Amino acid sequence: DVKRLIDVIQKLRRNLSARAPVFNKALDDRVEKTRFIKPAGVIICEGWFWGAIPEPRSALINPANRLEEEQDHLGIWRSWVNDQIARYKEAFVSDISIYLRAPSLIASREWRKLQEEENLAKNGEDKSNIRLDIEKFLAHFERLVRWIDKELSGRANIEIVLDEYHDIARIEQR
């Protein structure tokens, strides 16, 4: 709900209180209750694709992986995703941006797998197919992850590079 996100952020920037949806990671969806947020001197927003900008159209021509090659050979899905990212532009306006950079796509996959295993364990669900499910899930976002890693790492005010154990390897300030 991009419009709602922008509304909440704008209210907080104007020093007004706002009601924001609550996201349940284990359910991968919002829950019915909302959270009351009071104005604060600093607003921190985070997310897997926070700060992303659309890729140039020319970059969308060739598939990024096997999933795109087999299921999006015409580029309809990747073009649609690119158009959706453009809708977030107003929400992503900030005074400072910090990019947490994973050491590799492989590390991101492993971290996501661990996160999903924890979520499944909380819900008492079977974890036997998690690796295959994660690989399939992440294939949908591989292009965007690679683009952000290339583009945002050069644009963020601060880049925090993590090692494979989630420790800070280095911090770069621009």
Q: Where do the PLM segments sit?
A:
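Switch II (G3) loop of P-loop NTPases
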Residues: 43-49
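Glycine-rich phosphate/ribose-binding loops and adjacent secondary-structure elements
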Residues: 33-37
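Glycine- and acidic-residue-rich phosphate-binding/metal-coordinating active-site segment common to enzymes
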Residues: 40-42, 64
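Short gly/ser/thr-rich secondary-structure transition/capping motifs
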Residues: 23-29, 78-83
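Conserved nucleotide-sensing/catalytic segment adjacent to the nucleotide-binding pocket
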Residues: 1-28, 42
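Conserved NTP phosphate-binding and transfer environment spanning the P-loop NTPase/kinase superfamily
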Residues: 49-174
